[in-house]
Swiss-Prot record:
Calcium- and integrin-binding protein. Plays a role in intracellular calcium homeostasis. Critical for proper photoreceptor cell maintenance and function. Essential for development, maintenance and function of mechanosensory hair cells. The keyword Membrane applies. The lineage of its organism: Eukaryota, Metazoa, Chordata, Craniata, Vertebrata. Residues 66-101, 103-138, 144-179 form the EF-hand domain. Monomer. Homodimer. Disruption phenotype: Morpholino knockdown leads to loss of response to acoustic stimuli. Approximately 80% of morphants are unable to remain upright while swimming. Decrease in number of neuromasts. Loss of neuromast hair cell bundles at 96 hpf and a reduction in extracellular receptor potentials of neuromasts. Gene3D superfamilies: EF-hand. InterPro entries: CIBP (IPR051433), EF-hand-dom_pair (IPR011992), EF_Hand_1_Ca_BS (IPR018247), EF_hand_dom (IPR002048). GO terms for cellular component: cell periphery; cytoplasm; photoreceptor inner segment; photoreceptor outer segment; sarcolemma; stereocilium. GO terms for biological process: calcium ion homeostasis; camera-type eye development; mechanosensory behavior; neuromast development. One of its GO terms (molecular function) is magnesium ion binding. This is Calcium and integrin-binding family member 2. Ca(2+) binds at residues 157, 159, 161, 163, 168. Its main location: cytoplasm.
């Protein structure tokens, strides 16, 4: 007794449990991972809600992200500051949405944000080109990329505006059986 270090208050842990798909133990493990990224920045005591953000450059090098061609976009999509720097809340949100427990609808919202490179709330041909080039490590010719992107828009664009709205995107991924199994990260 007396030797136990308090990282979060019971109220904080309850709040994290209420708004994520994690148990108390998993939240504490996430804090450990967050602390490991920047031990000089991240305190072990979060009972006073410190205003700390771990830089994008440290987060994208986590083993769970470093091989993902969309790592920067993933982190930026969860960053409150829009620069890719993550507070602990942002970090927990990212892992919660990418957990196996998150529903398809929630994953779809963030997948759309990740693929919307120009942040105009549509996935246009240029967004698809960037996505395809990242997925294929730029091994396709410009003509092949163009053909695939045009075909994707033709098949998924329900209202004929030559870009994918969120509704178009959601309809498209509802027909992709592997979406849920590929859009996750284990902690």
């Amino acid at each position: 007794m007396g030797n136990k270090q308090t990282i979060f208050t019971d109220e904080q842990l309850d709040a994290y449990q209420d708004c994520t798909f994690f148990t108390r133990k998993e939240i504490l493990r996430l804090h450990g991972r967050y602390h490991e990224l920047a031990p000089h920045l991240v305190p072990m005591d979060y009972t006073n809600d410190p205003d700390v953000k771990v830089p994008l450059a440290l987060i994208v090098n986590m083993p769970e992200l470093k091989e993902n061609p969309f790592r920067n976009r993933i982190v930026e999509s969860f960053s409150e500051d829009g620069q890719g720097n993550l507070s602990f809340n942002d970090f927990v949100d990212m892992f919660s949405v990418l957990s196996e427990m998150a529903p398809r609808e929630l994953k779809a919202i963030y997948a759309f944000k990740i693929y919307d490179f120009n942040v105009d709330n549509y996935i246009c041909k240029e967004d698809l080109e960037k996505t395809l080039n990242k997925l294929t490590k730029e091994e396709l010719t410009p003509e092949e990329v163009n053909l695939v992107c045009e075909k994707a828009i033709e098949e998924a664009d329900l209202d004929g505006d030559n870009k994918l709205s969120f509704a178009d995107f959601e309809n498209m991924i509802s027909r992709a059986p592997d979406f849920l199994s590929t859009f996750h990260i284990r902690i």
